[in-house]
Structures are given as structure tokens and as C-alpha cells.
Amino acid sequence: MPRRVMRDVGEMACFLDLAQANGGMGKRWDDIGLGRYGLHNRNKVLAQTSDICESNSAGTYLGLVAFLENGNDIPKSEAGADRLARRIKPLLIAQGMPSFEKYQTYISPEGKSIAPVAVIYEHQFLAYQIGHRGKAGALDSERVLLYPSARFVTEPKLIALSDAGDRLGRLVSTDPALQERAMELGFRLRDADSGLTSVKLNDFLTRHQIPAPVTSTDDTRAVLPDLALLERMIETVGQCDPTGQAVTGQGEPVGTTEGSP
């Protein structure tokens, strides 16, 4: 099994090619040598995400797939977005599960057979490894963090709507205890002087004997389409009802809100 717990994945396009091989039917995990690791899985090669109608991470993954399948470009019109959404739909609709369950399933003992590849946030994986080392005294080398060759970097914003909110914003930026807690949860902190986001987290991870994430500076930065077009594509792929939930063939809503933004 893998010894490194963080690494780049070579080409996201190659992964998508596996999912579309055999005339669109896709490869199975057993087809690409999973048996060499003592495992067997006849499911399709897909990356598991949360409910695409309700999960920000799943919607972002849709945007990543769309960007790559559109020649590293975004759709510019409703007609183009509709065509692209219909084309990538098979790469996404066979993978969703309730949002609160997806991450818990991934870290469960059965996770490697249910979801060999899962789309999660970097901070979730880092927090899991920090907790695992604290409990077991070692990293979980059965799980590896893969960075796609084309990816997004999300930067959450805190917008103060009151004096109390403004004070909270200052505390989050300056209070050592709050910053330490943020790093325990795997979050990067922006350095006020350099503007870099990795230095403090990398130092924290090194102190806790966790390998720090290292990604190539040459990797393609994927771009999301206009928000209205992205929402249109999500609705097309997920067949979402007006409340934002995916619907079954009988029109019954399924899915839940995501527990770890």
C-alpha cells in the first residue's frame, strides 16, 4: 500500500479517460490493477462526491470536470453550458451519496472499497491525519491525498456585518489560540506580512510529524464558469428540484446538506 500520504496525481484528464473508456461505459477498478493490492472492486472508476445539488465541493468538482472536458475553458453561453452539462453528466451522476455520509464513509474501514477516490477538502484530510497520529501514534498510510493536475484554490471570506463580527474577524486573524485551533482542523492561515498561506500550517504539520502538502507551481489553475451558468449545469447534471435537492425518478427529494464546508 502507499507509504506517502500526499502526492500530486499526474493528469486529471487521464483519470477522466478511464471513466469514459469502453465506448463511454468506463473502466472498472479491477480493470486497472486493484487486485495487486489484495482488493477487488467492480464498480466504475469515478471520484465520489457529496450530493451535487447541495454540496459546494461537489459543485466545484463538476466545474473542474467541465473545464477539462471543454478544452481547459469555460462555457460562455446557456446553450454551451447545457451541451457541456449533458456531456459530462455520466461522469458525475453515478457517484453521489448523502453529503453527511460521504466523508464518514471515506474514513471508515470499508471506505477503500466503497469510495477508492473521494472528493474532499484538503483541511478534512489533514485534520483526519492529525487526529489519527494523536490517537494511533502514526499516520494512516492506507489513505493518500491526491492533488489533481488542474485544480481550484478556495479562499473562504469572513464578512463582518456588525461590530461583534468585525471583532471576530480580527480575533481569527490575530488570536494565537484560534489560529492554533484552525491549524488543528487543517486550515491554511494567510501570513499578514508575506501573504502566503502555507508557512504556518506547514510548520504546524512538521511539529506534529505530518508531511506538509507540496504541489507543483506549474499546475493548471481551473476556472469556474459564471455562477448562473454553473448553477444551470448543476441543475442539469443533478436533476435538482427547486429546493436544490436531487430527485429520484418518482420525484422524491434525496440528499442532505454537507456537514464539513
Put a short name on every predicted segment.
Residues 3-5, 52, 122-124, 163, ...:
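Solvent-exposed coil/turn segments that connect beta secondary-structure elements
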Residues 60-144:
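Ligand-binding pocket segment of bilobal, Venus flytrap-like solute-binding proteins
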Residues 1-54:
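A conserved helix-loop-strand patch within extracytoplasmic ligand-binding domains
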Residues 1, 46-49, 116-120, 146-147, ...:
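Structural recognition of the beta-strand scaffold that forms the well-ordered cores
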Residues 161-261:
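Extracellular/periplasmic juxtamembrane helices and adjacent flexible linkers that interface
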Residues 123-126, 130-170, 176-180:
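Active-site/pore-lining binding-face segments in mid-to-C-terminal subdomains
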Residues 45, 63, 154-158:
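Small-molecule pocket liners
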Residues 8-11, 21, 25-28, 57-61, ...:
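Stable alpha-helical elements in mature extracytoplasmic
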